[in-house]
Amino acid sequence: MMSASFKCPVSLSGVENICNGDKAIPGINSRTLFTGSSFLQRHHSANKIFFRTCGKKGSCCLFNIRAMAETDSGNGVPQLDISLSPRVAALKPSKTMAITDLATALKQAGVPVIGLAAGEPDFNTPDAVAEAGIKAIQDGYTRYTPNAGTMEIRTAICHKLKEENGLSYTPDQILVSNGAKQCIMAAAVLAVCSPGDEVIIPAPFWVSYTEMARLADATPVIIPTLLSDDFLLNPEVFSSKLNENSRLLILCSPSNPTGSVYPRELLEEIAKIVAKHPKLLVLSDEIYEHIMYPPAKHTSFASLPGMWERTLTVNGFSKAFAMTGWRLGYLAGPKHFVTACGRIQSQSTSGASSISQKAGVAALALGYAGSEAVSTMVKAYRERRDFLVQRLQAMEGVKLPVPQGAFYLFPDFSSYYGTEVEDFGVINGSEALCRFFLEKAQVALVPGDAFGNDDCIRISYAASLDTLRTAINNIEKSLLLLRPAAAASKAS
């Protein structure tokens, strides 16, 4: 096993020859497993791994190389087959994790990077919820629970859905999982999709939706949306994309990454189209439902006429209750589908943590929409949103719709694309712009192409106002380096 890491500009010594395109790492054959940054050439021949040029002097990049090489033993012993499933090859690497890894490397090198890439609250779990988890441990409540979740938490979820969403379910129509992500994977993809089925996904989208579809040998069908429409699905365009293979529509409201909220009137239009297609189901991702800014209001898709039978509603505790590490989510839907999802879960992880389930019950007991514990966090999010919106909308060349929920902004910086910056290179898209901000502004953001829209970048405002103020000041200063170049580019 060979493992090596290269960091630039921390140490360029010994790296330039590897990166300049005419050198290679010897002794590794064509069945090498490797991971790396975007500088790594995906094409590799026997005994060689090539790298693209790392950029001009001073550019930041990180290479992690882990290789397991086959050796010629000469003793006639068959060599180990280390090939992987085609499913792995079909999955795209996470750009969110890539930017996080690069930011971490810079921090370790002493660069004061501000991280605005994470999709999790910066608040602590409410005290009453944390105490319920601690009490569960102290009481010895540390054993397996039923696969679908305890009757206590499923009953509490049914009560929540009835009181807050106008939805009627029984406990056997609820599946509690290790986070909402597992519910989506088990429900939206593996349980209802077959090879050849199509999963309809409006873009921008959460990064995992498309990869989940591919894991089930289904085909993701991406429908772009417009900034001028607040990144909401256009019913006419949606209708034009449907056919006999359309199996699942995924809607996320409030949206990650845009913060857009679907108004009831638009959802009703979409529901009328869905009703015309007997095979089509809807997965409604409502994980951000409590992080809303008036006058926006949340509507559960399953509450619309004729949609209860077609809808799989996914929700959880991570975002509203600042419980990302507790890993607790749930699915609600017709028993036929929920039972199937439970069968898949039973053969993978089984039930969610008993301790987390006790904490989840306590969270739901806080009151309507989490009561003061959640509203206090939402008030802080809104203050941060308003601050960033004001600053970004005042910047030259930046377009930004005002998000109505979640804790993300998705501004359009495409007016700066195509420009070349000295000691950096060309800003040819959102990934390059995020690397530019990381290097020049020391701010970690997520490129929009990871979400299906290369014009934009995602900014998380799950950080203190002081942190956001420093970050936006740094971003604004760094853009001064691009404005002359952008003007020259347009003039030519």
From Swiss-Prot:
InterPro entries: Aminotransferase_I/II_large, AspAT/PAT-like, NHTrfase_class1_PyrdxlP-BS, PyrdxlP-dep_Trfase, PyrdxlP-dep_Trfase_major, PyrdxlP-dep_Trfase_small
An individual GO BP term: biosynthetic process
Residues modified as N6-(pyridoxal phosphate)lysine: K319
The entry's keywords: Aminotransferase, Chloroplast, Plastid, Pyridoxal phosphate, Transferase, Transit peptide
Residues annotated as transit peptide in the record: 1-66
EC number annotated for this UniProt entry: 2.6.1.1
Family annotation (PROSITE patterns): AA_TRANSFER_CLASS_1 (PS00105)
Compartments it resides in: Plastid, Chloroplast
Pfam families cross-referenced by the UniProt entry: Aminotran_1_2 (PF00155)
Primary location class: plastid
Catalytic activity: L-aspartate + 2-oxoglutarate = oxaloacetate + L-glutamate
Cofactor: pyridoxal 5'-phosphate
Binding-site residues, L-aspartate: G119, W206, N256, R458
Function as written in the Swiss-Prot or TrEMBL entry: Prokaryotic-type aspartate aminotransferase. Specific for aspartate and no activity with glutamine, asparagine, alanine, histidine, leucine, methionine, lysine, arginine, tryptophan, tyrosine, phenylalanine or kynurenine.
PANTHER family: ASPARTATE AMINOTRANSFERASE
Any further remark recorded for this protein: The orthologous protein in Arabidopsis has an additional glutamate/aspartate-prephenate aminotransferase activity.
Name the UniProt record assigns to this protein: Aspartate aminotransferase
Organism, scientific name: Pinus pinaster
Gene for this chain: AAT
